[in-house]
Amino acid sequence: MKNFALSCIKFYQNYISKILPKSCRYYPTCSEYAVWEFKNNDIFSALLATLARILRCNQLFKGGIDYPVIRKRFGSFSIFKRMEFSNIDFWFVPCKNSKFYVIKVLDSLKEKR
């Protein structure tokens, strides 16, 4: 279901958004916000957060920087356990109790392998 939602958003970004004027009042844009939510949250929470964001994106709200906030629990860390590293796509910046801001790593900063 997540993949279907992500493919719908990508279709919107690639085909529909290109012909419409830029009107989003926030950074990241509402469609990019939705992609980040669906990649890092469960489908129900992502859908609610995306809907709330789209409803806030109008002239009655100031706009500005509005990163997604998700709940995330990280596994335990041990210096004796071997860790596998892959490319980092998102940074999780602490916000409140087990809540984190989601910030995407710029493509130019990603390590080329």
From Swiss-Prot:
Output the Gene Ontology cellular-component terms. Answer: plasma membrane
Q: What is its membrane topology? A: Peripheral membrane protein
Keywords assigned by UniProt, alphabetized: Cell inner membrane, Cell membrane, Membrane
Where is it mostly found?
Answer: membrane
What does the UniProt entry say about where the protein is found?
Answer: Cell inner membrane
InterPro entries per the UniProt record, alphabetical: Membr_insert_effic_factor_YidD
Spell out the family assignment given in the record's similarity comment.
Belongs to the UPF0161 family.
Function, please?
Answer: Could be involved in insertion of integral membrane proteins into the membrane.
**What protein does this entry describe?**
Putative membrane protein insertion efficiency factor
Q: What is the lineage of its organism?
A: Bacteria, Pseudomonadati, Campylobacterota, Epsilonproteobacteria, Campylobacterales
